[in-house]
């Protein structure tokens, strides 16, 4: 039974309030035009704060200033975080210059690379939203469905110019994104000035959204594509994963994974991170159809009563893996083929110069926590990348580890890129520990943050690096991730060492994730400060240096030696 039939006789009083809001919005229009016109406040209406997400931006305020403004009887300093839809993370030099100009003209002067291979702008005031989005549109970019209860930015193993296989997989990411994009014209009419046609979306029936209907999805929906042996995308962490089967240089098909997701809520064991299950195999020409079928099963069966139980991972738990797969196959009209043996061996990005199969060169640039900014006395990443975009003809590609790649550089032009990297101090030395670390934004802009993350992790890495050097592990990588709340944006539950904020200056410490993103970690210590973090980790790192087996990763070591029990399934995460 589809969602329209299922909800026909259900009272909205039985559902989460967002379900009525979506239906009453008339395909995401709501009262956004009125909210944008209201100059008495920097905010939009309460209902519209939910609808802006579908259009790619969140209302936030500067939490560093919140108490001071309250004391002065001023409303919070509202602004918006604006996120791009950028499947596969590729932009041209011309598009980069637009991104750079928008950051300086409409936002806080920085760009933030996300763990979903796109950009976020912070500090965009309400009066600047239309100008910002219209400038992006002129450069053939948009923010549609970058947030909200829809298919989010589709990610894939980075750099389509590395090989023909990478290009094919990148193109599939674009096809999935285009196919699962909402069809309403609300974004174009409200923000881009497109003229509304009489009898348009506000009067139409559900054919406006043939896939989503007026109900849209119960929660966000995320898709990732990986090319073994690399698992840079953490393919098991998403609602849907496709793992490429490459034989003799030919893309034969994909293993299909369902049911991953990171978010949970502190103190609520019914919520948990979960890794996806491999349920079958499909050929490249069926990838889009499979993605659609999985999304429709979630649309029609996901929990619309409790948003904390609304992600696809909980639908898989409710229906069972086999039951969910059978629903997918019923919509496909065919069975998935048996999965193939495909091996993922490592996470992380290729940094520095490397050569593609066509002979052109690519430079992987480390960007600490994804923040592109000009720092006093340090890297001038915004200015440097602007200069590179002006001097370079090839694409710039983002990674899901918050780094970027300057692609398609001829041998004769490498010196030009090297000179610019040096001039703007962009190639800072970073240890393997730092290169494999990720943090979410958290304070001051994220309204969900309970503790610092991006602003704090670099200094904590300094202290952990000192412990690593003392133990003789300066050249070894351990995956460290931090988030300011339990929602999991930096995928901390896959880290070998994960930190999740509890309150200001205190974190839950998780250990035992798999180095290749194949195993969840588990809670080791709760609600601890930095001194306790270092007290706990120092002896473990020293033991690892002495007792590890050849080639053994830290996460595997702490599991093998009984320091932490392995998490073998999401529902066992809290056990």
Swiss-Prot record:
InterPro entries in the record: CysI (IPR011786), NiRdtase/SiRdtase_haem-b_fer (IPR005117), Nit/Sulf_reduc_fer-like_dom_sf (IPR036136), NO2/SO3_Rdtase_4Fe4S_dom (IPR006067), NO2/SO3_Rdtase_4Fe4S_prot (IPR045169), NO2/SO3_Rdtase_4Fe4S_sf (IPR045854), NO2/SO3_Rdtase_FeS/sirohaem_BS (IPR006066)
Enzyme class: oxidoreductase
Residues noted as binding siroheme in the record, renumbered to the chain: 489
Record-level Gene Ontology MF annotations: 4 iron, 4 sulfur cluster binding; heme binding; metal ion binding; NADP binding; sulfite reductase (ferredoxin) activity; sulfite reductase (NADPH) activity
Sites where the protein binds [4Fe-4S] cluster: 440, 446, 485, 489
Cofactor entry: siroheme; [4Fe-4S] cluster
Pathway membership: Sulfur metabolism; hydrogen sulfide biosynthesis; hydrogen sulfide from sulfite (NADPH route): step 1/1
Gene3D superfamilies in UniProt: Sulfite Reductase Hemoprotein, domain 1
Entry protein name: Sulfite reductase [NADPH] hemoprotein beta-component
Source species of the chain: Chromohalobacter salexigens (strain ATCC BAA-138 / DSM 3043 / CIP 106854 / NCIMB 13768 / 1H11)
Encoding gene, per UniProt annotation: cysI
């Amino acid at each position: 039974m589809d969602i329209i039939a299922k909800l026909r006789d259900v009272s909205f009083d039985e559902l989460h309030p967002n379900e009525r809001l979506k239906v009453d919005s008339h395909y995401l229009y709501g009262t956004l035009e009125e909210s944008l016109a209201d100059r008495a406040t920097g905010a939009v209406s309460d209902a519209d704060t939910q609808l802006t997400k579908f259009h790619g931006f969140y209302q936030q305020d500067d939490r560093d200033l919140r108490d001071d403004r309250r004391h002065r009887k001023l409303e919070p300093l509202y602004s918006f975080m604006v996120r791009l839809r950028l499947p596969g993370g590729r932009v041209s030099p011309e598009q980069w210059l637009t991104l750079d100009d928008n950051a300086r003209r409409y936002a806080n002067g920085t760009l933030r690379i996300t763990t979903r291979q796109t950009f976020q702008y912070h500090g965009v005031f309400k009066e600047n939203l239309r100008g910002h989005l219209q400038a992006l549109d002129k450069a053939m970019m948009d923010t549609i469905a970058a947030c909200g209860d829809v298919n989010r930015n589709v990610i894939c193993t980075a750099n389509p110019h590395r090989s023909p296989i990478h290009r094919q997989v990148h193109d599939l990411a674009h096809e999935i994104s285009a196919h699962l994009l909402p069809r309403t014209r609300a974004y174009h009419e409200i923000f881009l000035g497109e003229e509304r046609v009489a009898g348009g979306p506000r009067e139409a029936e559900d054919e406006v959204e043939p896939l989503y209907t007026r109900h849209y999805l119960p929660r966000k929906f995320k898709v990732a594509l990986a090319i073994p042996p690399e698992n840079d995308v953490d393919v098991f962490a998403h609602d849907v994963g496709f793992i490429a089967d490459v034989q003799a240089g030919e893309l034969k098909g994909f293993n299909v994974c369902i049911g991953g997701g990171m978010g949970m809520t502190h103190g609520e064991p019914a919520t948990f991170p979960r890794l996806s299950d491999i349920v079958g195999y499909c050929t490249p020409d069926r990838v889009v159809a499979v993605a659609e079928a999985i999304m429709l099963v979630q649309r029609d069966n996901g929990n619309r009563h409790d948003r904390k139980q609304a992600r696809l991972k909980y639908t898989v738990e409710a229906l069972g893996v086999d039951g969910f797969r059978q629903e997918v196959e019923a919509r496909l009209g065919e069975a998935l083929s048996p999965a193939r043996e495909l091996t993922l061996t490592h996470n992380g990005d290729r940094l520095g110069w490397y050569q593609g199969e066509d002979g052109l060169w690519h430079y992987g640039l480390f960007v600490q926590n994804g923040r592109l900014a000009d720092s006093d006395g340090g890297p001038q990443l915004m200015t440097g990348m602007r200069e590179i975009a002006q001097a370079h003809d090839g694409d710039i590609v983002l990674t899901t580890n918050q780094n970027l790649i300057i692609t398609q550089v001829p041998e004769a032009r490498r010196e030009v890129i090297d000179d610019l990297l040096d001039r703007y101090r962009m190639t800072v030395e970073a240890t393997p520990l730092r290169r494999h670390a990720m943090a979410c934004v958290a304070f001051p802009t994220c309204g969900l943050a309970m503790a610092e993350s991006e602003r704090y992790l670099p200094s904590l890495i300094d202290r952990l690096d000192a412990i690593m050097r003392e133990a003789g592990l300066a050249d070894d990588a351990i995956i460290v991730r931090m988030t300011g709340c339990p929602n999991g944006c930096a995928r901390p539950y896959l880290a070998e060492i994960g930190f999740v904020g509890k309150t200001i200056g205190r974190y839950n410490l998780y250990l035992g994730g798999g180095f290749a993103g194949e195993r969840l970690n588990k809670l080791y210590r709760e609600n601890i400060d930095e001194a306790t973090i270092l007290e706990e980790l120092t002896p473990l790192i020293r033991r690892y240096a002495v007792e590890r087996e050849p080639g053994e990763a830290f996460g595997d070591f702490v599991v093998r030696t009984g320091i932490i029990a392995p998490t073998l399934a999401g529902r066992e995460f809290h056990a």
